[in-house]
Amino acid sequence: RVFPEHHAALITLSREEMRRFDFNKGDTEGLVNIPLQMKGVYFSAFLREDTEKDLIRVSLRSQGTFPCNKFAARYFNGGGHLNASGGQYLGTLQEAIRVFEEALAEFNKP
């Protein structure tokens, strides 16, 4: 999903999708970077249900000065570097998507 008003994109992957399409560990490596190739997208997120634990794995990437690390720390119990960060969410994938969408609107407010 693309959020043009926030120059952002979101990719999600559920356990069911991983089972249905026979995903193996490592198959999603680099997936979070793909939306950054789209014109106007400077921030990308990948939310994936963990295959072993009841949590959501969060990968964040950006271009330019968008602070992935601050976004990860504030909303997803994570951290990292300016343009590459990660975290986790203890809840459902749908809840994590809602948090992400609300965070996009809130994060860049003055």
Predicted regions mapped to residue ranges:
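Hydrophobic helix-and-loop "lid/oligomerization" segment in the mid-to-C-terminal part
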Residues: 1-75, 80-110
